[in-house]
Curated annotation (Swiss-Prot):
Keywords: ATP-binding, Kinase, Nucleotide-binding, Serine/threonine-protein kinase, Transferase. Belongs to the protein kinase superfamily. STE Ser/Thr protein kinase family. STE20 subfamily. It comes from Mus musculus (Mouse). InterPro entries: Kinase-like_dom_sf, Prot_kinase_dom, Protein_kinase_ATP_BS, Ser/Thr_kinase_AS. ATP binds at residues 1050-1058, 1072. It is an enzyme of class 2 (transferase). It catalyses: L-seryl-[protein] + ATP = O-phospho-L-seryl-[protein] + ADP + H(+); L-threonyl-[protein] + ATP = O-phospho-L-threonyl-[protein] + ADP + H(+). Residues 85-119, 250-274, 330-363, 396-472, 486-508, 576-607, 734-767 are annotated as: Disordered. It comes from the Eukaryota. Residues 250-261 have a biased composition (Polar residues). Residues 262-274, 330-345, 450-464, 734-748 have a biased composition (Basic and acidic residues). Residues 1044-1307 form the Protein kinase domain. This is Mitogen-activated protein kinase kinase kinase 19. Its EC number is 2.7.11.1.
Length: 1311
């Protein structure tokens, strides 16, 4: 909307209050117009915290631009506004009589009685509701709260109003749930009022019986729009919560106010085509409050249309402290029932002005209002809801909630928005938001069809600026406003009893909620909207017994009202408690008090975000009125967020304490028990958890950013604590320290030096976190001797996740944490109870090479005879050996020279991992390390973060390490003296399976080498000198532990998978792992025995063309064979990469293959599986034969000796199998010659013989003794073809041997 020129100020400003406090009511010149009565009620307290209540100015043309300085009034003023006359309809006496009934009843909580209209005039429906806290919801010493109604009626014109009638109704507010709606508005130029999805409410000052004054306002008829003759009288009715059945009241329409006239009677400039729009209409009064129209649908009531002429009588009753909700109803010309919309308030912030004696409403533009649906035949119906809401200690709960889902976006005619400006001293802006509260109970079915016609309301943020130039905004007729002020009420007697019930002191605040409601014409609905309505109706039924507690406290200040954590669960986003359903939940973010004066344009999306995990709200007991709800909005961070007001007083400064104090802890503990049941657990988008109550002060950010609706999952996923998190302060707040202001926009939880977790800026603190924090706050600091690990169930969220993190990343620990649960380590365990980690399955874990450049090795602690030392004591649960049976006994032998030469120790507790480095010259089998405090311990005990705790733990660790080292040295000395290296050769068994002692006399020493938890057995006599050097002589002599890391897969075979590994010595190795079938114990033992024989055979093979064997390891049911790594890959891979090989190349390769096979045959070893995949190529061109284990297994034809087992074992190799192997006619050395011929054919052509056949077909072809094998292509030389023909001789007895083939002419070319 374009900016409009600023109109002049006129004395005809709406709601002008007489300048003399004691003067009689002013009577203005009354033309032939209607007068609207307005009444002001004063209070004994100041309306403003800073200045006198500014009188209102009567708006009329030609008046002075500024009003005089009037003294403060001590009595109320009744204001009568006149409107141009219009044809009125006649009201039936029956309706008048029914509408004049006034009921005043006191109700106990959760009981609601309808309130009848007053009996003096046609009740247009203004009834105010004072919502106050109930004893069941608030911890107050007052009795049950009352609902004080204020009835305002329109009566025939008269010069001055008399306060003869007042309608009041007492009713306790029943627990209901208010529903919120975000509203949208367009941006308008500077110094205009900006709207956003926020609001700020201030509690009302005390109200009492106040004197009344009345004056008449004349609103001149606007000549700019004479064609608009429709008038509308907004009817105000008592908005009683939990009205589950409609209140039937007769209502007649006296006039329909023309929207264009309404605007132009107040402002002289602006567009002519202003029409009322149900969703954006706003009333503006001189106290800087806007009266918005809300197109909300609520309890529909049947109001017979009646005609009413002249003036309507307005009357107000006494107030009780608490928010007053005024719901306005629309009047229709015809007899169709109209909708009574209720519980929809526009919370308008109170404007205070310092140093000025008068307040002016400034506006930059007029608003173009459009009647959405119902302006077409029977006139515009605009329900107006005036809601006077007190923030302090109030419970506002509508009976049912309406869904915004079936509201239709206004069309082009109804898209205009209302823009206006206001002012506030000291550049402190207060913002407003418009909640939507529409109960879904309708008395008339046709009225329900109008739900689809509701326009989308928009949240408005109204920063109040210093402005003294009054400009009138386009308004609809203002019906009634109650202003708290000073003095005593002179109202009728029946209103006074309700005022006498008021016992608690009120707090300084002036807050108004005024909403404009629209009445929809049921005749305008179409089929589509009816369908939408019917679908919406089924979803918009909320439980009537839902309850929301409100907590608020106000800090008085000299210049402004400091809002302390005002919480309106049904109106704001701040309420973290569960909500009935995501469908019913619409929340508008809280307005931040510190937001700057700037226009904000919200999104086009009018529907607020819906919580994904909304739960049923359960009633809870909130804290007292003085208690500040510590659950803060992430955009509402201010001084009061860090300090809690202890003694709240209406005057004078308050006493505050920080949140971390015992007082806060006590309050939080109480609140945790009281509110645990209805708090909603929210989650943030990146699955992150808030573990701290502290949130950063983000006033600069929230002034420029729109509040976002964030919800947490119901099951909190704790964040990963970072390395800086201390053990002592992990997950809880120290009680002697308050929360810090944490700035920044961290996306992940980060830890502060004090151990607190900083949460992302958009996260809310969930109730689950609150409970955890409350559980942790009172915990005193534990000394290292007292910090015994608690059970997992007692740990906080942070501790539990930290434990999981540590166990997963660092691979540590068991329940006994620091030391292994060995017989002699129980004393060290008692000395180290401060281990913070919880049980994992493995007792020990090795710090991998990525985390530590040093290796750790086990330590022996028992000094017992060698024949009674069990494997667990000798190798205590280290590297997956933790599950060794305690009953298993193994004989242990160590070389005396090995131990004696390597007994020196260098315990260095100050090292990073409290582990000694592995020197190749030192024997590390008898040294244990406290890997419990490995890298994790260093991270937890970082001296920069907790020096005292680190020093204590370091001291304890030093003492324990020294004691254990001394003990271990003695143990090793004794064991060394008792060991006999000539007789004992031992192997540690897995899971208590003892390996038989090698009884034969031999100089071979079974060397246990730990390679990634696997034991490698090396026999010294089979290793050549070069290989000994490669594997390090010291490792053979001193049994050095070697670790390896598994890498990528090099290949897969029928019997296992080959991996590339990197040892701790920096060597690349090939590790073949074969899985053993453990289902049959006998078969497994037999298979293992055969594999052991095969391994023993392979260890004897030392040839340049045979891959070097390094060792084996049996881990559970997996056998690992460690071999020399050949980086060039297999011949098959070379063929795949480069194609068929040239004759000279494969001739050279064939010669080396034959040399290796000849070596095998000389040692009575038959490979039986020579093929391209089992022939490896070194980068230097050296050929290596591999996979001897599979060849040996093929000779046995499977464990059971059946053909099926053989076929299974032969999968993938039938093209290279000799006929005798397939026929199982007997194995011999000549079978390898057949395989060599097939391999040469593969190198020459790229594929083995019979590759065009299926595997099974090829096997039958080869074994049938009928078909001839294909020869080499003609492009190869004759010697090459003859060599292949000889190798593929079907009769194995006629086949040449390897030595004979080495003399073949084909191989002579390669020499």
């Amino acid at each position: 909307m374009d900016s409009m020129p600023r109109p002049e100020r006129h004395a005809e400003s709406l709601l002008d209050i007489c300048h003399e406090a004691g003067s009689t009511p002013m009577e203005m010149t009354v033309s032939q117009t209607e007068n609207l009565t307005l009444q002001s009620i004063s209070s004994s307290e100041d309306f403003d915290l800073e200045d006198d209540f500014s009188p209102f100015i009567l708006a009329r043309e030609g008046a002075a631009p500024r009003g005089e300085n009037w003294p403060r009034r001590t009595e109320g003023v009744e204001i009568i506004v006149t409107f141009p006359p219009d044809p009125l309809q006649e009201a039936s006496q029956e309706d008048l009589k029914e509408s004049n009934q006034v009921t005043s009843e006191h109700q106990e909580r959760e009981q609601v009685h309808p309130v009848s209209p007053p009996d003096d005039a046609e009740m247009v429906g203004l009834t105010g509701r004072m919502l106050t806290t109930q004893p069941s919801l608030l911890k107050t010493d007052g009795s049950s709260e009352e609902l004080c109604g204020v009835d305002v009626a329109l009566s025939p014109p008269r010069p001055c109003l008399d306060s003869s009638l007042a309608a009041s109704a007492a009713g306790e507010v029943a627990p209901c749930v208010l529903k919120e709606q975000q509203r949208q508005s367009d941006e308008f130029p500077t110094s205009d009022i900006s709207y956003s999805s926020r609001r700020t409410g201030l509690p009302l000052p005390p109200l009492s019986c106040l004197p009344m004054r009345s004056c008449i306002f004349n609103m001149e008829k606007s000549p700019k729009s004479p064609r608009h003759r429709e008038r509308k009288v907004p009817s105000l009715s008592l908005s009683v919560p939990k009205l589950l059945e409609p209140l039937s009241r007769p209502l007649s329409q006296s006039a329909e106010f023309s929207s264009s006239k309404n605007h132009q009677e107040v402002t002289q400039e602006g567009p002519v085509e202003h029409t009322l729009r149900g969703s954006n209409c706003t009333l503006w009064s001189r106290n800087m409050c806007s009266f918005r129209k809300s197109g909300k649908q609520g309890v529909a009531e049947s109001w017979p249309s009646q005609e009413m002429e002249g003036w309507d009588k307005t009357k107000t009753s006494g107030f009780k402290e608490g928010p007053s909700l005024f719901s306005c109803e629309s009047v229709k010309e015809d007899t169709t029932p109209t909708e009574r919309e209720r519980d929809s308030g526009y919370h308008v912030s109170e404007m205070q002005r310092g140093g000025e004696d008068s307040q002016y409403l400034s506006s930059r533009k007029k608003e173009s209002w459009t009647a959405r649906v119902v302006e077409r035949d029977s006139g515009v119906e605009h329900p107006i809801l005036c809601k006077l809401l007190e923030v302090s200690n109030s419970e506002m709960t509508p009976a049912e909630e309406k869904e915004i889902g079936n509201e239709n976006v206004p069309d082009a005619k109804s898209n205009s928005v209302h823009k206006s400006g206001a002012m506030e001293p000291h550049a402190a802006s207060e913002e407003v938001s418009v909640p939507k509260n529409g109960p879904s109970v309708n008395s008339d079915g046709p009225a329900e069809e109008l739900e689809g016609h509701r326009d989308i309301e928009q949240n408005r943020k109204i920063p109040m600026e210093e402005e003294t130039n009054p400009e009138m905004n386009g308004v609809v007729p203002l019906t009634h406003i109650a202003f708290p002020g000073e003095g005593t009420s002179k109202g009728p007697a029946r209103a006074e009893p309700h005022l006498q019930r008021r016992k608690r002191p009120a707090q300084n605040s002036n807050s108004f909620n005024l909403l404009a409601h629209r009445e929809h014409d049921k005749l305008q609905t179409n089929t589509h909207r009816t369908k939408l309505d019917s679908r919406t109706k089924a979803r918009n039924r909320a439980p009537p017994n839902l309850m929301v507690s409100i907590q608020a406290s106000i800090k008085p200040n000299m210049h402004k009202n400091s809002i302390k954590t005002q919480v309106f669960p049904a109106l704001e986003l701040i309420d973290h408690r569960p909500h009935p359903s995501s469908k019913f939940q619409r929340r508008a973010p809280l307005t931040e008090k510190k937001s700057t004066h700037q226009t904000q344009k919200p999104k086009k999306q009018a529907f607020p975000r819906i919580g994904k995990h909304a739960g049923i709200k359960k009633p809870g007991i909130p804290l007292s009125a003085e208690t500040t709800d510590p659950r803060l909005h992430f955009l509402d961070l201010k001084y009061s967020d860090m300090f809690k007001e202890i003694n709240s007083a209406s005057n004078g400064p308050g006493i505050y304490e920080m949140f971390g104090t015992p007082v806060y802890c006590h309050i939080r503990e109480a609140e945790r028990h009281d509110h645990r049941c209805y708090r909603e657990i929210r989650t943030a988008p990146s699955g992150r958890c808030v573990v701290n109550k502290c949130q950063s002060s983000e006033s600069d950010r929230c002034s420029n950013s729109r509040a976002r609706l964030l919800q947490k999952r119901q099951h909190i996923k704790p964040p990963k604590p970072l390395h800086g998190l201390r053990q002592k302060h992990r997950g809880f707040i120290s009680k002697d320290k308050g929360c810090k202001d944490m700035g920044g926009h961290t996306e992940d939880s980060v830890s502060e030096p004090d151990g607190q977790m900083k949460s992302p800026g958009n996260d809310f603190l969930s109730s689950k976190d609150d409970a955890q924090l409350m559980h942790l706050i009172p915990i005193p600091e534990l000394s290292p001797e007292q910090k015994a690990p608690a059970p997992v169930s007692d740990l906080s969220i942070v501790e539990e996740i930290f434990t999981e993190e540590c166990a997963d990343e660092e691979g540590i620990l068991n329940d006994d944490s620091l030391t292994q649960s060995l017989g002699d380590l129980k004393e060290p365990e008692g000395l180290h109870p401060q281990a913070p980690l919880v049980p994992s399955e493995n007792s020990w874990a090795v710090l991998s090479e990525k985390r530590s450049g040093k290796r750790v090795s086990p330590e022996k602690h028992n000094v017992e005879p060698l024949d009674k030392i069990n494997a667990e004591q000798m190798f205590p649960g280290y590297l997956e050996f933790d599950s060794l049976s305690e009953k298993s006994k193994t004989l242990v032998s160590f070389s005396s020279c090995s131990f004696q030469e390597n007994l020196e120790r260098a315990p260095s507790p100050t090292e990073q991992h409290w582990a000694r480095s592995l020197e190749q010259d030192s024997l590390e089998n008898n040294s244990t390390t406290y890997q419990t405090f490995g890298k994790i311990s260093q991270e937890i005990l970082d001296p920069g973060k907790n020096e005292e705790l680190t020093d204590e733990l370091l001291g304890c660790l030093v003492e324990e390490l020294l004691a254990l080292d001394e003990k271990d040295n003695n143990s090793c000395q004794i064991m060394t003296n008792e060991a006999d290296a000539k007789n004992l050769n031992l192997v540690f068994s897995r899971r208590g399976n003892t390996i038989e002692e090698l009884g034969r006399e031999t100089t071979d020493v079974k060397l246990q080498r730990c390679i990634n938890g696997f034991r490698i057995y090396d026999e010294e006599n089979f290793l050549t000198s070069n290989e000994k050097k490669t594997l390090s002589d010291k490792s053979l002599n001193h049994e050095e532990a070697i670790f390896w890391t598994k890498g990528e897969i090099l290949g897969r075979g029928a019997y296992g998978t080959v991996y590339c590994g990197l040892t701790s010595l920096g060597q690349l190795i090939a590790v073949k792992q074969v899985a053993l079938d453990t289902s049959d114990k006998l078969a497994t033992e037999k298979e293992y025995r055969k594999l052991q024989e095969e391994v023993d055979l392979l260890k004897a093979l030392k040839h340049v063309n045979i891959v070097a064997y390094l060792g084996t390891c049996l881990e559970e049911n997996t056998l690992s064979i460690f071999m020399e790594f050949v980086p060039g890959g297999s011949i098959s891979s070379i063929i795949n990469r480069f194609g068929p090989l040239p004759e000279m190349v494969f001739c050279k390769y064939t010669r080396q293959i034959l040399q290796g096979v000849a070596y095998l045959h000389d040692n009575c070893v038959v490979h039986r599986d020579i093929k391209g995949n089992n022939v490896m190529l070194m980068p230097t061109g050296i050929i290596k034969l591999i996979d001897f284990g599979c060849a040996k297994r093929l000779a046995w034809a499977g464990l059971n000796g059946t053909h099926s087992d053989m076929l299974k074992s032969m999968r993938g190799t039938p093209y290279w199998m000799a006929p005798e192997v397939i026929n199982e006619s007997g194995y011999g050395r000549k079978s390898d010659i057949w395989s060599i011929g097939c391999t040469v054919f593969e190198m020459a052509t790229g594929k083995p013989p019979l590759a065009s056949m299926d595997r099974m077909a090829a096997m039958f072809y080869i074994g049938a003794h009928r078909g001839l094998m294909p020869p080499l292509p003609a492009r190869f030389s004759e010697p090459a073809a003859d060599f292949v023909r000889l190798c593929l001789t079907r009769d194995q007895h006629e086949r040449p041997s390897a030595l004979q083939l080495l003399k073949h002419s084909f191989l002579k070319r390669s020499q």
